[in-house]
């Protein structure tokens, strides 16, 4: 092991706005707030940092967050009320499904339903 994951960082134009959005989506509390940097520590003790950068988002994310929910439609509607947008229709799969979303700055994320790796320890070694 070389190191440990400390946090996931999102480059953005408005750290406070995105932190408030993501706190409403995943829960937790806002910590380490400055004009250039805001972080949210979620209930699972995963930290999402939001860092101000001068350039706008230009291409599709290479990494995205999957957020486990009980109901895709309810979650998508609640996120839309906070400024998110849906990307297409929900996508079914054999064990559940997912809805691709954009946060208020256009970063992709997914709401997922069905078994998750956190709940399913059969993949643990």
Label for each model-derived stretch:
Residues 2-10, 31-32, 39-41, 46-51, ...:
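Vicinal oxygen chelate
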Residues 5-7, 60-64:
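Short, solvent-exposed beta-strand edge segments and adjacent coil->beta transition regions
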Residues 9-11, 66-68:
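Short hydrophobic/aromatic beta-strand micro-patches
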Residues 14-29, 75-81:
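Amphipathic alpha-helical segments
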Residues 14-15, 71, 98:
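Residue-level preference for nonpolar/small residues embedded in alpha-helices
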Residues 33-36, 73:
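A short, compositionally biased
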Residues 35, 43-45, 58-62:
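Short connector loops at helix/strand junctions that flank enzyme active sites
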Residues 52-57:
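Short, flexible, solvent-exposed loop/turn segments with mixed acidic/basic and small polar residues
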């Amino acid at each position: 092991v070389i190191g440990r994951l400390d946090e996931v960082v999102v480059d953005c134009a408005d750290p406070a706005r995105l932190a408030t959005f993501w706190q409403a989506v995943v829960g937790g509390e806002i910590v380490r707030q400055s004009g250039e940097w805001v972080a949210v520590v979620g209930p699972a003790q995963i930290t999402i940092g939001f860092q101000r950068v001068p350039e706008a988002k230009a291409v599709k994310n290479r990494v995205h967050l999957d957020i486990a929910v009980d109901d895709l439609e309810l979650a998508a509607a609640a996120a839309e009320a906070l400024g998110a947008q849906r990307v297409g229709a929900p996508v079914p799969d054999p064990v559940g499904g997912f809805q691709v979303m954009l946060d208020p700055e256009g970063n992709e994320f997914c709401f997922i339903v069905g078994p998750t790796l956190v709940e399913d320890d059969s993949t643990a070694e």
